Amino acid sequence: MKDRNHTFDFLCGLCIIRMISLHVMDFCGMGEVQWWTHVMEWTFYFMSFFFFKAGYFNKGVNNSPTGEYIIDRTKRLFIPYMSAGIIGMIIYFSFLPAMLDKYHNPIEPLSWDHIWKTSSFYGNRPTWFLFSFFVTYLVVHFIEKVKGLRWIAVLFPLVSYLLFLYGNPLWMDANNVFMGIFFFYLGMLWKHIMKRFSRSSIIIVSIVMIIAFLVLNVVGHGEYTMSINSFKGSFLMTMLIMVLAICGLVGFFSSVNLPRVPVIYYIGQHSMVYFISHYPMLYFYKFMHLSFGRSIWNRPEEVFILIPAVFCLCTWMVPLIERIPWLSGRWCKS
């Protein structure tokens, strides 16, 4: 099988496991527990990995006419983004009358500017990723129209950082798109480098990069939260750590012929289903408990219930959702 089926699905699986676990911890009020914050400090770069992967496996974003390309990206990303978001909103607002009746407030603040300021939906906040992914693909398509313009992507992390310093002014949370484009092109570049050198050379370089990442993340730790385009610590150190971690892990696991890891591999292979499904489940569980006057906040035992329950439900839903193109983005080829 191709390296993608092993290396990238393994890493995608780890990303999804980390993301769902993070959201469960936050829902249960355990997001600031010390041991968990350490986990986040060592895995903060995982969301950027999806953009890196898209660039690595890019077969040419400029091979199709612009109209056809936009339609294809709309079907694969924007329609699932809207569909998953609307489903989340239906679940969220279905419980709103009960919350107002019982607690005299909507539990979480509601505002009209949420519609244009953010790309997330009430009830399914992680959908921001699909919108940013969609915009990234479109921008890259037009960048590729101009020969040599792709190298401007080297400056895009700085653009995202400046936007962060100025309060992330772009609507629809588009401030992180520049980081997405940078990692998209980094994926393309790293694949090109890996093809030009021997497997043993890539293994050695990757090990050096991983060791450098481990050292630098201790000496000059910085973090980047892609969902809100937020930088913590030194900008240059954060970018260096992210590049070393992602390129090092991809280079190493691709070169050592990583064997198939059943559960993680499956989650990574069907990551879209887990991604769009888990958050509405968490809201449903939370609001059901609140409806009966019981909170899941600061209850560690709920973490041990929710994590296996969510993964089991998402796994059960894989064949169901993947047959629905407007949710999975898997449309029949004409």
What do these predicted ranges mean?
Residues 1-334:
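Alpha-helical transmembrane segments and their immediate juxtamembrane cytosolic regions
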